[in-house]
UniProtKB/Swiss-Prot annotation:
Protein name (database record): Cullin-like protein 3
GO term, biological process aspect, one: ubiquitin-dependent protein catabolic process
Family of this protein: Belongs to the cullin family.
Pfam family, one: Cullin
Lineage: Eukaryota, Viridiplantae, Streptophyta, Embryophyta, Tracheophyta
Organism per entry: Arabidopsis thaliana (Mouse-ear cress)
Molecular-function GO terms, alphabetical: ubiquitin protein ligase binding
Xref: InterPro entries: Cullin (IPR045093), Cullin_N (IPR001373), Cullin_repeat-like_dom_sf (IPR016159)
Length: 255
């Protein structure tokens, strides 16, 4: 057994960092030997030694720093170079990869969660890891993502086919980055979508009055309601449905 005096934080952290690097390479799809039992035990042992004999707070801080650096140095550049649908696909992919990374990495450091964080009342490793994405990636990309989704919804309203699964996956990014609440979804996407919806149907109503017969005009609102219900079913959050129907589509009055 290694004596406490022989344990050095830098050595143990290097073992943990080595395992993290392998995880990153695996998630990035790079050629990498399997993340095997030996590596997992090495990370578990290093975590135990740091928590038992050294400075668990330092390990906690290093964990956050490592994930933040990955988000800033790898994830953000991959998103900044893409636009529109390509950017949306990358964002959804990166969010899913980040969740996987946090889950796998935090499991290797579970002793830190159990022996230190729970006693100190600090956020869990999972929470810290997910917050790194929210603070470093989501915060920068959410505005562009919302605009790209609204552009797709506009295309669909105009009769074009869109990738609804993609839209739903990116909507999940908004919802899940609320960390248990709908705050991000409501403030960063839904609010803009409702404004865009009102503007769209206000413009449409003006044209319908001029171009459609009285009978056709009275049928338009119900047709639009049905299509908006379908959008909620396929990719919007269920709580959006009543808000959509409260939107006054310009001069369209539901009689």
């Amino acid at each position: 057994m290694v004596a406490p005096t022989e344990i050095k934080f830098e050595v143990e952290w290097s073992n943990i960092q080595q395992g993290f690097t392998k995880l990153i390479r695996m998630i990035e799809g790079e050629s990498e030997p399997a993340f095997n039992q030996e590596i997992m035990m090495m990370m578990h042992t290093a975590t135990y030694r740091i928590c038992a004999y050294k400075n668990p707070q330092q390990l906690y801080d290093k964990y956050r720093e490592l994930i933040e650096n990955y988000a800033i140095q790898t994830v953000l550049p991959s998103l900044r170079e893409k636009h529109d649908e390509c950017m949306l696909r990358e964002l959804a992919k990166r969010w899913n990869a980040h969740k996987l990374l946090v889950r796998l990495f935090s499991r290797r450091l579970v002793y830190l969660d159990d022996s230190f964080l729970s006693k100190k009342g600090l956020p869990s490793l999972r929470e810290v890891g997910l917050n790194c994405f929210r603070d470093q990636v989501y915060r920068e990309m959410q505005s562009m993502a919302a605009e790209a989704i609204l552009a797709l919804i506009h295309k669909e309203r105009e009769g074009e086919q869109i990738d609804r699964e993609l839209v739903r996956n990116v909507i999940d990014v908004f919802v899940e980055n609320g960390m248990g609440t709908l705050k991000k979804y409501e403030e960063d996407f839904e609010r803009l979508m409702l404004q865009d919806t009102a503007s769209y149907y206000s413009s449409k109503a003006s044209r319908w009055i001029q171009e459609e017969s009285c009978l056709d005009y009275t049928l338009k609102p119900q047709q639009c309601l049905q299509r908006e219900r379908e959008r909620v079913t396929h990719y919007l959050h269920p709580t959006t449905e009543p808000k959509l129907f409260e939107v006054r589509y310009g001069i369209i009055i539901w009689n």
